[in-house]
Amino acid sequence: MALNFNAIASKSQKLPCFALPPKATLRSPKFSMISTIPSGSKEVGNLKKPFTPPKEVPVQITHSMPPHKIEIFKSLEGWAENNILTHLKPVEKCWQPADFLPDPNSDGFHEQVKELRERAKEIPDDYFVVLVGDMITEEALSTYQTMLNTLDGTRDETGASLTPWAIWTRAWTAEENRHGDLLNKYLYLSGRVDMRQIERTIQYLIGSGMDPHTENSPYRGFIYTSFQERATFISHGNTGRLAKEYGDINLAQICGSIASDEKRHETAYTKIVEKLFEIDPDETVLAFADMMKKKIAMPAEFIYDGRDYNLFDHYSAVAQRIGVYTAKDYVDIVEHLVDRWKVKELAGLSAEGRKAQDYLCSLPSRIRRLEERAQEKAQGSTPVSPFSWIFDREVKL
C-alpha cells in the first residue's frame, strides 16, 4: 500500500476537491479529538513536548460499525483463509532488495555503484522528488499496520494471532516492508538526494500517523485499502515507465517489481469487499459512498520535513505534472471499483442504500467534469518550490 497523495485536493495543483469533508454524525457512539499544532504554526521546536504532530487532525468518529456486524467477519474466517491468504507469496519465492542493488561482497561493487550513480545523473530533479515521496510513504509502513489493527472484527488481538485476518495483516506488512527498504537503499546510493532530510521526513511522518476516516470499520477499511493498493500500483508503474524513458532499466525493474506486489495486494483487498457486497450489500454500499464523500485520505497527507508545511501539496503537484499520479488516475480508480464491485447491479437495497448506489454510479462523470474545468483554469500557471530532499533545488509544480 503506501504511496499516494490526494491528487484532487491540492490547491497547488489547482485541481478541485470532489467530495465533501468528513462530518461527525450522531450514529457514531464515540468521538475523539487529537490535539495538534494548527497547520499554520511556524515553529515545532518551540514546544516543550518532545514531539507534536505538525498537522491538525479534526474530530474523529470511532467504532461506528454496529457490534453485531463483527460476527460477519468471524464467519468469514474460513473463506479468508482459502481466498485471501492465497494472494501471499512464500518468503523464499519473494524478491528481496539485494536482488536489485550492487552486491557489497563482489569485487565489482564499487564499479556497480559508479554505474548506478552515472545512470541517476540522467534523471531530472522532479522525478527524484516524486520517487523520494514514494519511498517516504512506503517507509511509514508501521502506520499502515497500526491502521489495519484498529479495525473491529479483523484486528490482530495479540500480536501473533492465528486468525486469517491477523495472518494477512502481518504477512502483507512483511511483503510491503521490502518496498521502502529497496527504494531507500537505491536513493542512498544514487547520490542525488539529501538523505538526512529524507530521514527526518520519515520520522515526522511516522510520528504524525494518518487519518483514513475508516471509523474502526472493516467495511470502510477494506474499501480504503482497495483504493490505495490500486493507486500505488498505478504510481509505481508510472515511475517505472519514466525510469525506462530516462534510460535506467534497473530502476524501471525496481519500480515494476514493487508495482507487481501492489497489484497482487489490490486483488486480495478488492475480493474482500466483493464478498461483503455479496453478503451485506446495504452496509457495504453505504460504507463505499461514505468513503467517497469524505475523499480517500492519502497516507502521506501529513508529510513534513521540518520546513515546508505545504510539502504534501507540493509533492502531489509534481507527481500530477509529470504523470505519476493524477486527478485522472483518481477518478479512473473510482470508476474501476464501481464497475469491479458491480454497484449498478445491486438489488434489494434500502432507500438509503439506493441513494448511495445512485451517488456512486454518477460520481465518476461528475468528477471528470470538475477536473476538466479545473485544468482549464490552471492553464498558464507555472509556480516553483524548493525541496529539501534535493538540497533545496527548485522544481516546477
Curated annotation (Swiss-Prot):
It catalyses: octadecanoyl-[ACP] + 2 reduced [2Fe-2S]-[ferredoxin] + O2 + 2 H(+) = (9Z)-octadecenoyl-[ACP] + 2 oxidized [2Fe-2S]-[ferredoxin] + 2 H2O. One of its GO terms (biological process) is fatty acid metabolic process. It is an enzyme of class 1 (oxidoreductase). It comes from the Eukaryota. GO terms for molecular function: metal ion binding; stearoyl-[ACP] desaturase activity; stearoyl-CoA 9-desaturase activity. PROSITE patterns: FATTY_ACID_DESATUR_2. Its main location: plastid. SUPFAM superfamilies: Ferritin-like. It is found in: Plastid, Chloroplast; Plastid. Fe cation 1 binds at E138, E176, H179, E262. Homodimer. PANTHER family: ACYL- ACYL-CARRIER-PROTEIN DESATURASE-RELATED, STEAROYL-[ACYL-CARRIER-PROTEIN] 9-DESATURASE 7, CHLOROPLASTIC. Belongs to the fatty acid desaturase type 2 family. Converts stearoyl-ACP to oleoyl-ACP by introduction of a cis double bond between carbons 9 and 10 of the acyl chain. This is Stearoyl-[acyl-carrier-protein] 9-desaturase, chloroplastic. It comes from Gossypium hirsutum (Upland cotton). The lineage of its organism: Eukaryota, Viridiplantae, Streptophyta, Embryophyta, Tracheophyta.
